Amino acid sequence: MMLHAQHMPGQPGAPSLVFLHGFSGDCREWQPVGEQFHGCSRLYIDLPGHGGSAAIPVGGFADVIRLLRATLISYNILKFWLVGYSLGGRVAMMAACQGIPGLCGLVVEGGHPGLQNERARAERRLSDGRWAERFRHEPLTEVFHDWYQQPVFASLTAQQRQALTALRSQNNGETLAAMLEATSLAVQPDLREALNALAFPFYYLCGERDSKFRALAQEVAATCHVIRNAGHNAHRENPAGVVDSLAQILRL
């Protein structure tokens, strides 16, 4: 089994870029950024529970990474960079720490390296469980209206919240809930030590108004690029800034 994806071929010898979206996004999320790198091969993946992969069930990160590997093999992508936002960033970090073959570099935007104690994990398990129940049983427009009131999204304008709520409400609540539980921070290990031991380039992107993730970026051995005029979802709020950072990272 493999994940649904959109593949855009590039020039021979150029890097292959594999893009992983955030929770409730899909393969279109990174395209405004990725399509600025038309010389590179670009693979935009739908994670389980999302988009064209909505019907693919997973029990945890191990299943997600197994599906990611199978998808890369199916497209004959043997050497690549992983670029992931939020949930996609956490999947990318997990894959990197588990030694996914062919990985040349890692770029994470607003991805959490992991909670550091059992109390925090227990609190997160309860919180994600409550959200999952809402995704299963309530209209998605109502759930996402409240979702985007969370402190991490404080930099969004009312208009941006409204647009995101309308976009994300096109998802399937049941499959979103299942993926939320399977990949919760409550079940993710603390990756700091493993990330600090990576033998390939690791870069971290965060919006200048995203104080929580700017602080987390200092806890991992990554080169940090701060994206101006952006909050947690920097590639949506300032795509040109993220394109500039990726161009510097990839030396294109």
From Swiss-Prot:
Q: What is its EC number?
A: 4.2.99.20
Question: Is Transmembrane helix tagged as a keyword?
Answer: no
Q: Which reaction does it catalyse?
A: 5-enolpyruvoyl-6-hydroxy-2-succinyl-cyclohex-3-ene-1-carboxylate = (1R,6R)-6-hydroxy-2-succinyl-cyclohexa-2,4-diene-1-carboxylate + pyruvate
Q: Does the keyword Lyase apply?
A: yes
Q: What class of enzyme is it?
A: lyase
User: Which parts pass through the membrane?
Assistant: none
Classification via Pfam families: Abhydrolase_6
Q: What is known about what this protein does?
A: Catalyzes a proton abstraction reaction that results in 2,5-elimination of pyruvate from 2-succinyl-5-enolpyruvyl-6-hydroxy-3-cyclohexene-1-carboxylate (SEPHCHC) and the formation of 2-succinyl-6-hydroxy-2,4-cyclohexadiene-1-carboxylate (SHCHC).
On assembly, the entry states:
Monomer.
User: This chain belongs to which protein, by name?
Assistant: 2-succinyl-6-hydroxy-2,4-cyclohexadiene-1-carboxylate synthase
State the organism of origin: Salmonella paratyphi A (strain AKU_12601)
